[in-house]
Amino acid sequence: VPKTIDNDLPLPEDITTFGFETAREVGTKLVMNLKKDAFTSRNWFLVMSMGRKAGHLALGIGKSAMATVTLIPEEWPGGNIRLQHVVDILVMTVLLRLLEGKNYGVALLAEGILENLDEQDLLALDNLKRDEHGHIRLADVNFLDILKKAMETDLAGLGLQMRMVKQV
């Protein structure tokens, strides 16, 4: 039985891998709860899901829970993601929500965003360590903290202040 929560094995189009549906279902419930929390507390939640090489799980959760925005590494062909581009997308999402009168939301990101950051952006990160296979030790990088601070700085430059909470 093919087993991976990433759903990244070459199976027929309508066949998901063992474990993917369970992970998507649990993740969906969590994000739906965070959406309720975001609404009642008027906060933005930044959420990171598993998916170092593929954003299938994040996309599945984001679509099922109707997250405000879902970012997956596949959106950047070539795997050269600039940190500021990610921040710009998130800040623009916040601004668009404000135009709708909503100062809250849930931003869901696949951990592959960090894995595919531009080399210059990676070098600027604190605590960047790699394992014996050359993969970034994702747990050692406080990526959501980095995004949160960058978003707060950009929003402050626009005269806005938002409460943001990070979740992993």
Residue ranges of predicted features:
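Accessory alpha-helical/coil subdomains and C-terminal extensions
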Residues: 12, 16-166
